[in-house]
């Protein structure tokens, strides 16, 4: 283990056979950051960071990224249990061989344009990316991200963690059943979704790899169940989240699990979404974190 401190296209409805799963409550399905700690939900009036080839767009550039993408993206409906389904945005890579599947877990703001644009970048990097809307059953109204965000923040605090993990189980099974998919999957999440992606490593023994962007770590008592390698990527100016790193690192070290993490000096919570912020530190963090993300998935899912 190591710590490295470094300066809408076509809509298609599909249904999968019901997936039966069990889950154990792991961490609260809540995000405890204050509004001031979050990157802005809408950045339409904020300056966008310069678009760097090979990086996801920031929030201000997400819609343009989606509108100009050459890749095939589609909406699907995935059956997750008796009477339950989750909608998801799926983006396919342009490659001649079968691809690993990556689940993309949204922030507290819900399945925003920005999260879908991150899925598009993962597809550009060679993965089948599936971003589930974990608020599907809340029936939030359609609308721009600025309308969705405050509703999502309130709704996400009511989600049951075990239910969230069952949704992810079903989405993973769906993804690996696709004709173009390998039978391996990883997960990446941001903020609230980062905590969920770490919790999924506790929950899912078949998970191939997890990447956690500025999400809190699970309770140390749960970490013995982790089997997948976990990569954590954190802003140095994110004290509440960063305080949960050392206990996880120590516990996973004793257990002999693979947990690597980087803390980027000066970068804030949500640095990948808000690349123009924190006086250049967020963009520097994004430029280091995203290649590390892709390399992690390639190492553990492509080999």
Question: In which residue ranges do the predicted regions lie?
Answer:
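Acidic catalytic loop of the alpha/beta-hydrolase fold
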Residues: 237-242
């Amino acid at each position: 283990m190591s710590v490295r401190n470094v300066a809408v296209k076509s809509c298609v409805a599909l249904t999968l056979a019901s997936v039966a799963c069990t889950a154990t409550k792991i961490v609260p399905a809540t995000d405890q950051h204050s509004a001031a700690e979050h990157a802005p939900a809408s950045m339409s009036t904020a300056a966008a960071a310069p678009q760097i080839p090979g990086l996801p767009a920031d929030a201000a550039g997400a819609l343009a990224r989606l509108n100009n993408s050459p890749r095939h993206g589609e909406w699907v409906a995935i059956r997750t249990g008796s009477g339950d389904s989750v909608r998801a945005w799926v983006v396919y890579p342009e490659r001649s061989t079968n691809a690993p599947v990556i689940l993309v877990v949204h922030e507290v703001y819900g399945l925003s344009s920005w999260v879908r644009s991150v899925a598009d970048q993962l597809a550009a990097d060679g993965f089948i990316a599936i971003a589930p809307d974990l608020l599907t059953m809340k029936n939030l109204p359609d609308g721009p991200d600025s309308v969705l965000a405050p509703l999502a923040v309130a709704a996400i605090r009511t989600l049951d963690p075990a239910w969230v993990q069952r949704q992810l189980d079903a989405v993973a099974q769906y993804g690996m059943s696709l004709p173009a998919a390998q039978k391996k999957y990883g997960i990446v999440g941001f903020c609230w979704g980062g905590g969920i992606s770490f919790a999924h490593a506790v929950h899912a023994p078949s998970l191939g790899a997890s990447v956690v962007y500025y999400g809190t770590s699970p309770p140390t008592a749960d970490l013995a169940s982790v089997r997948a390698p976990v990569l954590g990527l954190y802003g140095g100016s994110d004290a509440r989240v960063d305080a949960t790193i050392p206990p996880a690192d120590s516990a996973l070290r004793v257990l002999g699990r693979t947990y690597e993490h980087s803390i980027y000096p000066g970068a804030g919570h949500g640095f990948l979404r808000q690349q123009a912020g924190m006086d250049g530190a967020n963009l520097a963090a994004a430029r280091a974190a995203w290649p590390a993300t892709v390399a992690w998935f390639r190492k553990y899912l492509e080999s």
